[in-house]
Amino acid sequence: MYDVLIIGGGNAGISAAARLLKKGVSDVAVIEPKQVHTYKPLLSYVGAGQAPLTEAERTQRSVTPEGCVWLEDSVVSVDPAERSVRCASGMEYGYRDLVLGQGLIADEAALPGVHAALRFPDVASNYLDRAERTWRLVRDLPAHSHAVFTVPRPPVGCTGTTVKPLFLAAAHWKRTGRLPTVDITLVVDRESLLGVPDLDPRLAGHLRDLGVRVLMDTAVAALEPESKRITVTDHAGVDERIDYDMLHLVPPYRGPLWVQESGLAGEQPHGVVDIDSRTMRHRRHPEVWAAGDGAAIDTDSSGGALRKQISVLVDNLVASRSGGAMSSYDGYTVAPIAVEAHTLIAAEFDRTGALASSLPSFLDPLKPRRSAWAFDRYGLPQSYWHMILAGRL
């Protein structure tokens, strides 16, 4: 039995483990099957030819904090009543408190054939371990071709990052003289792109300037990679078949099946963990906590949001043991969207969609800036490896 058992060895799990250890919780274990830990935000730049994949990866062992046990295994079920977790190896682990940072998986029930489509050379996804292919397709796409990009319905890891590949690809095609001859289509399965009234019109303007055909409130309904074609369905139920020369696919996502089967999702759609989005504590099981993409956080997920969530989660977990006051997560998040090769909008907002900029009030918080791009490309990765995963930021 572990004092704190953490499911998921990504940003949420590792940073939570580091913070817990710093607060004196000594018996901490992380369940994570992968041997490679990836800094996912950097994959946008891998897909744009601005970063090598090796810069986004470390071994899982190297990022696991000293004093934390790494259980190299996959979770198959959780019994919150018994406080136990069963793994694919057959091992079962008990816990006093359970922290869920399991993230999301592609929802093959909502869009069949996602992983099969990735076997075709014209389909790529920065979200599904194909960022290097994204760059090859962007680099080699001929003039007079058609590129299609997709944005799924929630939940998804950082909605802003779903449109980053389009803008960075367009910047490359523009720089190499292939725009405006490359046709670009963006399929967005939601009524508004980010649901931020001040930001969405700005992004729409950038898309218009690039001549992008935007299909709002439209879902990818079927994949035909052998024919280089997708079928989309709009809000009125009207189907359209779209041929492509390049498809950047961000599929619909859901929580792992064991979340729902274990009763941890409650009434939440798509199998995300049913937590109080202010305290990060499960609504029915007080010894269960969750953060990140796979939790019902009631705001757009992002690395900036997760850093604040983990701080609140760890503080509250420790406080719950001593009867201390609980902290509250205010819903802060950030959408770092590169709209040119070397300029970026760092849009900060809260769970209501209101801007929550950390910039001085006299500066336009939605202006694309080269400094914001440089921080996103070079500063944040260093902060991630050396500060965030170490529980120091």
Language model features with spans:
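FAD-site-proximal beta/loop scaffold in flavoenzymes
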Residues: 110, 115-143, 243-308
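A conserved FAD-binding loop/helix module that cradles the flavin
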Residues: 291-339
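FAD-binding core/adjacent interface of flavoenzyme oxidoreductases
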Residues: 68-164, 168-177, 237, 248
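Short, electropositive alpha-helical surface patch
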Residues: 154-172, 303-312, 344-347, 351
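Beta1-alpha1 glycine-rich phosphate/pyrophosphate-binding loop at the start
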Residues: 1-69, 153-197
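FAD-binding beta-loop-beta segment adjacent to the flavin cofactor pocket
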Residues: 271-288, 339-353, 357-359
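A Rossmann-like FAD-binding core segment of flavoenzymes
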Residues: 68-78, 85, 93, 174-271, ...
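C-terminal auxiliary extensions adjacent to catalytic cores
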Residues: 346-393
